[in-house]
Amino acid sequence: MKNIFLSLFAVLAITSCIQTNAYVQNKSAKEVQEIQDRIALKNLVDTFSNLADEKKVTEQMELFTDDAEVSTIENGQERPPYVGKQAIGKAFANYLALFHTVYHSNGQQTVEINGNIAKGISYCQVVLIGNFDGKEMQRTAGVRYSDTYVKKDGKWLIKKRVSNFMYSEMKELKK
């Protein structure tokens, strides 16, 4: 009887250990996936900025879903969104063409991930330099991006972006 009890206890203990191990492995896999997703989302935002600095709009469009939306808020007023890669790409190219120097410095990012959808807030300081009316002008802006991302075929893409220009300063650069 004692042997039966010990055998039964051993089987229950082993089963419990196996279940605990499976739970820990599953939890660890989810945590690793979340870390990978967070790194991928930060890389997505930084790559967007790097490509903007180089005026590589075609490559930037690869970071968006086909039906993406991008809108801008300036002075508290939201402009109508650009919808679709073609409209977004044209708007970006036209705007960046105004400047010979484009510089983005990204800061903090927070994201909430829910499966293959994520929402994020990113901060960026943008410096744009161009010639206007014969003067070398520098625009410096603090931008807060409110993004919605989707993971498609294992790759995170921007589905929606609202660029809120929280402040903006324009000054003439003296030579």
Range-by-range predicted roles:
Residues A10, A52, A118-G120:
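Small side chains
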Residues V57-C124:
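A solvent-exposed, acidic/Ser-Thr-rich amphipathic alpha-helical stretch
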Residues Q19-D66:
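Short, low-complexity N-terminal intrinsically disordered segments enriched in polar/charged residues
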Residues N21-Q33, L96-K175:
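A beta-strand edge to alpha-helix "cap/lid" segment located at domain peripheries
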Residues M1-Q25:
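Bacterial Sec-dependent N-terminal signal peptides
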